[in-house]
C-alpha cells in the first residue's frame, strides 16, 4: 500500500469516527454547563474570601485599638510621674511639704487603723450575729450580702495592715497583728465554708425553696471575681513599668488584696457534690442485695440546672452547660470504674439503657446537644459500654451453654434412663429447655433497651454459639451411631434410638423457638446490619432443622441395621416358600409405634417418609444378594405380596398417594423387568428411566441376569437392548436425584 493510500485510509477512519460519535454533538452543551458551574464556584469562593478578609480587617482594627489604648494608658501614667517630678522641681520646699503630707497621712492612717483595731471584735461579733440569726431562722439569709460586704471591708483592712506592718521591718509586728486578726480569720473561713456549702447543696436549696439565697450566693461569687479581676489588672499594669515607677500603684485600692479564686472554688464544690452523689449511688448498689444501680438523681439535678438556675445566676457562668459537663464527666468516670471492676452484665445493661434515656432527656430539656458536652459519652456501637456488655454477655452465655451442652451430651452418651418427657409425652433433653429459657430471658432484657447496636451484637453472638453447639451435636451423634452400628452393640449403652428421637424433637422445637423469640427482635435492628443477621438467622434455623433430620435419618439407619440379616434372605430360593418380609415390616412397625408415642407430630411425618424410603432402598439393594434368583411369575407374585405387607403397615399412618409413590420404584424396576421379554424390555426400560432418570443400568442388568425363567441367550439379547436404549437416551442430569441414587451394591456405603 502506498503512503497516499495509507493517509487516505486514516483520514477516512477519523472522519467516520467524528461522524458516528454522538458525544461531539453534545460537546457545546457540556462546555456551557461547565462554564456555568465554574462561574458559580468562582462567585462562592469570592464571597467567602471577602468575608474572610473582612473578618481579618476587623480583627486587626480591634488589636490596633487595644494597643493604642494600652500605649495611651502607659503615657498617662508616665505623665503623672513627670508631673510629680516637675512639682518637686518647681516648689523649693516640696520635699518638706511632701514629707509633712506623708506624716499627716500616716498619722491619719494610724489613727484609723487603731480605731478599726479597737472596733474589730465588735465588727466581727456583729457579722457573726447576723449570720447566726439567719441560720437559726432557716430563712433566705437576708443578711448574707450585708455580712459579706462588712467582712470584705474587714479583710481589706487586714490585708492593708499586714502589708504596712511588713514594710516596717519589725519581725514581731506582723505576728502581733496576726494574733489580733485571729477572730477575723476564723470568721472569714467560716463564712467561706458557709457560702461554699450552700454551693455544694445548691439543688437542695432549690428544692427547699431558698431561691433568694442562691441569688445572694452568686452575687457574692461575682463580687469576689470582680475584685480578683481588678487586682489582676493592677498587677498586669504594674508589671509593665520599671520598679522605680510603681509607686503610684501602692495607693490604689485593692493592691494589697490576695487573689481568692472564689469562682474556681465554687466549681470545685459543684464537682465534689456530684462526685459524692455518684459515689453514694455506687456504694448503694454494692450494698443493696438486689444489685440494682440507680442514677435517676442525674435527671432531677440537671432539670433544675436547665430550667431554674440560669435565671438565678449570671449568664457568663453558663450554669446549665457547666453542670452538664460536671455530671457527664462523673458518668463517664462511673462507666470507667464499672469496666475496671468485676461488674455484672446487668449493670452494663442498665448503663446502656440509662445512656439512651440520658440522650432523650437532653433532646427534650437541654438548650444544647449532648454531643456538645465534654467528655463524650461511651454509649456508641464502638463505645466501651457496648463492647464490655457484649463481651461479658457472650462470655456468660458461652459458659452457661457449655455447661448445659456438656450435661446434655453426658446424658445422651450414658443413657442411664429414658429421656425426659414433656407435657405432650414427647421425648426431649432438659438442657435444651433450660438453654432456650435462658436465651429468651436475655432477649427480653435487651429488647427493652431499644439499642440496635446492643441487640445486633448480642443476636450475632447467640447465633454463633447456637451454630457451634449444632456442629458439636453432629459430631456426637455421628460418633454414637458409628459405635451402635460397629457390630458390637453390647458394648454401647442401650436407648440410642430414644435419645436420637429426643435430640430430633428438641432441634425441631429450637427452630420454632427461633421464630418466636429471635425473629421479633429484628425490628430493632438497623437496616445496615439486618441483612447479615437475617442470613445468620436463616443459617441457624436451617442448622436446627438439619440436626432434626439427621436424628430421624439415624433412627432409620438403626432400623435398617436391625433388619439387615432378614434382608439377606430376600430373592433366595427359600424366599418363594417363606419370605422374611413380615419380620422386616413388623420390625418397622415396632419402631413406628415407639416413635408415634414420643415424636413431635411434624417430625413423625418426616420419619414415616424416610422409613418407607429406607425400606424401598433396602429391598432394591437385595437384588445384589448372593444367589438371588427371579423365577418369572412366581417372583412377581412374591414381590407383590411383600409390597402388600409393607403397604399394610405403613398405610396405617401414611396417605395412599404417598404410599404409591414410595413403593413405585420396586414396581417400575422389578415387576417391569420380570414381566418384560425381548419385544417389551425396551418399553419397560424407557418407562423406568422416564420416572427415575438416575436408575442405574447395573441394577437393571442384575435383575435380568438373575431371571431363571428365560434362557441365557434371550437374557443376553435383552441386556443388549437395554444397553443400546440407555446409550440412546438424552438424559438431563441436572434434575433432582431420585431414590435410585441411594441404591448401591452390597459393597457400597449404608444409609446413615
UniProtKB/Swiss-Prot annotation:
Family annotation (InterPro entries): EXOC3/Sec6, EXOC3/Sec6_C
Q: Which GO terms describe its biological process?
A: exocyst localization; exocytosis; intracellular protein transport; vesicle tethering involved in exocytosis
Q: Name one GO molecular function term.
A: SNARE binding
> Which keywords are on file for this protein?
Cytoplasm, Cytoskeleton, Exocytosis, Nucleus, Protein transport, Transport
Q: Which Pfam families match?
A: Sec6
Q: Name one GO cellular component term.
A: cortical dynamic polarity patch
Source organism's superkingdom? Eukaryota
- Main localization of the protein described in the UniProt heading: nucleus
Where is this gene product found?
A: Nucleus; Cell tip; Cytoplasm, Cytoskeleton, Spindle pole
The protein's matches in Gene3D superfamilies, at most eight in alphabetical order, are given as: 1.10.357.50, Exocyst complex component Sec6, C-terminal domain
Q: What does this protein do?
A: Component of the exocyst complex involved in the docking of exocytic vesicles with fusion sites on the plasma membrane.
State whether it acts alone or in a complex, and with which partners, per the record.
The exocyst complex is composed of sec3, sec5, sec6, sec8, sec10, sec15, exo70 and exo84.
Q: Family, per the entry?
A: Belongs to the SEC6 family.
Protein name as catalogued? Exocyst complex component sec6
**What is the species of this protein?**
Schizosaccharomyces pombe (strain 972 / ATCC 24843)
